[in-house]
Amino acid sequence: MAIAVYPGTFDPMTRGHEDLVRRASNIFDELVVGVAHSPNKRPFFSLEERISIAREVLGHYPNVRVEGFAGLLKDFVRKNNARVIVRGLRAVSDFEYEFQMAGMNRYLLPDVETMFLTPSDQYQFISGTFVREIAVLGGDVSKFVFPSVERWLAEKISKPE
C-alpha cells in the first residue's frame, strides 16, 4: 500500500491545497494531510481550527486522512508508515526552500522520497498568507477558498482574540 504525507500549516486550507490533495489522492492508496503545529509561524487559526477546516474541505476524499502533528516531520512520516512526502511548488521562489527541506528529509529519512507537484494554473499564485491578508482587509476571497473556509475566516475576523 503506497502511503504519502502532505504536510503543511494550512492556515487556512486553500483551493490550491485542495487541488494538490485531489491530485495526490489519485496517485497514492492513502494520503495523510499533516497539519503542522508551526508555533514559529504564529498561525492565524489554532491547530485544532486548522484541522477542523481541513477535514471540512477534504472530508469527501475516501483515501485522505487529516491529522495534526507537532515536532519533526520525520516522526510523523514514520508514525504513518509513509514512503513519500508530497510538497507543492508554486514558483521558483518556493524551489530553494523546498529543495533544502527535501535534502534534509532525505538525510533524516533515507528510504522516503519527496515528490513535488506544481499547482494547476489557476492556483499558482494562491497562498494562505495572501488569503488571510485579503480577508482581514475586507476583500473577497471566494475564488481562493471554499465557502466553509470563508465562514471560518469571517468568524475569526469578527471575533479578534
Curated annotation (Swiss-Prot):
It is found in: Cytoplasm. Signal peptide: none annotated. Its EC number is 2.7.7.3. Its main location: cytoplasm. Its cofactor is Mg(2+). Pathway: Cofactor biosynthesis; coenzyme A biosynthesis; CoA from (R)-pantothenate: step 4/5. One of its GO terms (molecular function) is pantetheine-phosphate adenylyltransferase activity. Pfam families: CTP_transf_like. The keyword Magnesium applies. The record marks H17 as: Transition state stabilizer. Keywords: ATP-binding, Coenzyme A biosynthesis, Cytoplasm, Magnesium, Nucleotide-binding, Nucleotidyltransferase, Transferase. ATP binds at T9, F10, H17, G88, L89, R90, E98, Y123, Q124, F125, I126, S127, G128, T129. The keyword Membrane does not apply. InterPro entries: Cyt_trans-like, PPAT, Rossmann-like_a/b/a_fold. CDD domains: PPAT. It catalyses: (R)-4'-phosphopantetheine + ATP + H(+) = 3'-dephospho-CoA + diphosphate. It comes from the Bacteria. PANTHER family: PHOSPHOPANTETHEINE ADENYLYLTRANSFERASE (PTHR21342:SF1). Reversibly transfers an adenylyl group from ATP to 4'-phosphopantetheine, yielding dephospho-CoA (dPCoA) and pyrophosphate. Homohexamer. Belongs to the bacterial CoaD family. This is Phosphopantetheine adenylyltransferase. It comes from Cupriavidus pinatubonensis (strain JMP 134 / LMG 1197).
